[in-house]
UniProtKB/Swiss-Prot annotation:
Residues 1-34 form a coiled coil. InterPro entries: KH_dom_type_1_sf (IPR036612), KRR1-like_KH1 (IPR041174), KRR1-like_KH1_euk (IPR048550), KRR1-like_KH2 (IPR048548), KRR1-like_KH2_euk (IPR048549), rRNA_assembly_KRR1 (IPR024166). Part of the small subunit (SSU) processome, composed of more than 70 proteins and the RNA chaperone small nucleolar RNA (snoRNA) U3. The keyword 4Fe-4S does not apply. Belongs to the KRR1 family. Keywords: Coiled coil, Nucleus, Ribonucleoprotein, Ribosome biogenesis, RNA-binding, rRNA processing. Disulfide bonds: none annotated. The keyword Ribosomal protein does not apply. Transmembrane segments: none annotated. It is found in: Nucleus, Nucleolus. Gene3D superfamilies: K Homology domain, type 1. This is KRR1 small subunit processome component homolog. The gene is krr1. Part of the small subunit (SSU) processome, first precursor of the small eukaryotic ribosomal subunit. During the assembly of the SSU processome in the nucleolus, many ribosome biogenesis factors, an RNA chaperone and ribosomal proteins associate with the nascent pre-rRNA and work in concert to generate RNA folding, modifications, rearrangements and cleavage as well as targeted degradation of pre-ribosomal RNA by the RNA exosome. It comes from Dictyostelium discoideum (Social amoeba).
Length: 374
């Protein structure tokens, strides 16, 4: 019996190996035709599902700001019509400022309630209805990125958020074209709608932008990747050698820690320990005195301090009452007379030096023309 069991086991192992070989061969023979995505989810239709799928109601609710109230009132009928196709009810509460989405017995897609939740979230974040309704399709998903906690300084935050949008929205348009996603920057959030691959790229660009990495670097990288995807020879190769590697130009300005020079004259050992209050009291004998003596001494010291402070206050008051010292008039008169004498002597010297020169005597004959002698 034992021998038969061994032979049977060997036969089973051989059959397994043959089956595995056949499977590998079949896989190699199978070829996916071009233009078909094998990872694309299959569409779920109403005919593929039974009459009733959900046996319990589930609901989601979100709040919306006051400035969205008017727009939501205008498009709410469209929202109801779109969600009614999936068997979902929606309510708009203007008093509380909330939107609620609930499943019904007619709901045949269990994922539809999650898609409806994303729809009302996007509508509350100022996304227009034309773009928000795309979330209900299987090919589209949404991602709401919170950017409020990346930067503390408000001015710096506004500057980096504007950098993400770019001049006339050019940077945002480039991101949308490369990632195949719709992107909207609103307040402290960035909403994006598109395929999963594009949403991951959008999140990376947004987070890097708020970490002070310009979006142009990521945009360049995406452009190079898109060109490399077209080349069939480079599809299965590593692309790191083709991608640009940007280095930081702004270095962190850290203060250099200066090493302290050792003083040669400094003592090699630590200074002696200072005495405590108890030690000083023991030396003076106060430590062994009775409590009454200690109290009397404290009182005497306190009175002496009060007396000293009172004396200082009296001296300051008396200073204001003391008349200021008069100036000596004799010194002022002597200085004035000496100044007057100096000025007079200077004037006399100037007159002597600048005497008028005597004018030359002029005769009448000097002004008459003399006849020329023949």
């Amino acid at each position: 019996m034992g021998k038969k069991d061994k032979t049977e086991i060997k036969v089973e192992e051989e059959n397994k190996e043959k089956k595995q070989y056949k499977k590998k061969k079949e896989r190699e023979e199978l070829e996916i035709p071009k233009g078909i995505d094998p990872w694309k989810p299959l569409e779920l239709k109403r005919d593929d599902v039974g009459k009733r799928v959900l046996y319990d109601d589930s609901s989601f609710a979100t709040l919306f700001p006051k400035y969205r109230e008017k727009y939501l009132q205008e498009i709410w009928k469209l929202v109801e019509n779109v969600l009614h196709e999936h068997g979902i009810e929606c309510k708009l509460d203007l008093i509380e400022g909330s939107m609620t989405v609930t499943t019904t017995k007619k709901c045949w897609d269990p994922v539809a309630i999650l898609k409806a939740r994303d729809l009302i979230k996007l509508l509350s974040r100022s996304v227009p209805f034309e773009h928000a309704q795309k979330v209900l399709n299987d090919d589209y998903n949404c991602d709401i990125i919170k950017i409020g906690g990346f930067v503390r300084n408000k001015e710096r935050f506004v500057k980096r958020r504007q950098r993400l949008v770019g001049p006339d929205g050019s940077t945002l348009k480039a991101i949308e074209l490369l990632t195949k996603c719709y992107v909207l920057v609103q307040g402290n959030t960035v909403s994006s709608i598109g395929p999963w691959n594009g949403l991951v790229q959008v999140r990376k660009i947004v987070e890097d932008c708020l970490k002070n990495i310009h979006p142009i670097y990521n945009i360049k990288e995406l452009m190079i990747k898109r060109e490399l995807e077209k080349d069939e020879t480079l599809k299965n190769e590593n692309w790191e050698r083709y991608l640009p590697q940007f280095k930081k130009t702004n270095q962190n300005k850290k203060k250099k820690v200066q090493k302290k020079k050792k003083d040669r004259d400094a003592a090699p050992f630590a200074p002696p320990q200072l005495p405590r209050k108890e030690d000083l009291a023991m030396e003076s004998g106060e430590y062994f005195a009775s409590e009454e003596k200690k109290r009397r001494k404290i009182q005497a010291d306190r009175e002496a301090k009060h007396a000293e402070s009172d004396q200082k206050r009296k001296d300051e008051r008396q200073k204001s009452q003391i008349a200021p010292a008069e100036k000596d008039r004799s010194t002022t008169t002597t200085t004035n007379t000496s100044n007057i004498q100096d000025t007079l002597s200077n004037i006399k010297n100037n007159l002597k030096n600048n005497k008028r020169k005597e004018a030359p005597t002029n005769n009448a004959d000097d002004f008459v023309l003399k006849k020329n002698k023949k």
